[in-house]
């Protein structure tokens, strides 16, 4: 079933069309639907292989939003997101820092979250290394299911006016862990633990509330500015009511829960 076009009324506060750079690498497999979600929210998507950005770093400056979508970049060899994260550290650090310092937005979904974490771009590294990482689920296997999520009074731009979401997950290395309790406490105090797994408000949990064992039930984290956000669930897989697994039996609203994330990103530049 084709998705309905976004009513013009939802775009009345957008004075210009922000451009989103959707990056991919070998193994990325969610770039098209993620770009589509941004375009449904009013953005213009540009799809680029990571090598294109390496060759043309000025490409980043031509966009207002940068997105690292889901998939298995470089086959998740070594560890999920590790190779692309290393490329970012060694060859794109200046480009990414300039993008951030210009007040722009960065979104990492699933593998993209793993990339942002392991590159140190989301949570900067210090003299002890990474503050946090994403590692193997407690079950030791790949998980694909729907989860309930709640926001955490965060400063995150992408979660403005969002309280609860129902989104799918699909990952093997989605367990968020911090280096120590001090890092976790600091992230809490700074309102950076933006999104958490929670129980279903209807009591219809289809599995453990926290599917992967993440510390403090963390499903998504933002940086100190609230403009860089990474999450393990896939918002692009629930932007239309027909994406909901119970859309024929329940009133799921005019839009899928994930759509608000993309709408907030676009509206930020309105």
State where each predicted segment sits.
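N-terminal beta1-alpha1 cap of cysteine-dependent amidohydrolase-like domains
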Residues: 1-109, 113-124, 129, 135-143, ...
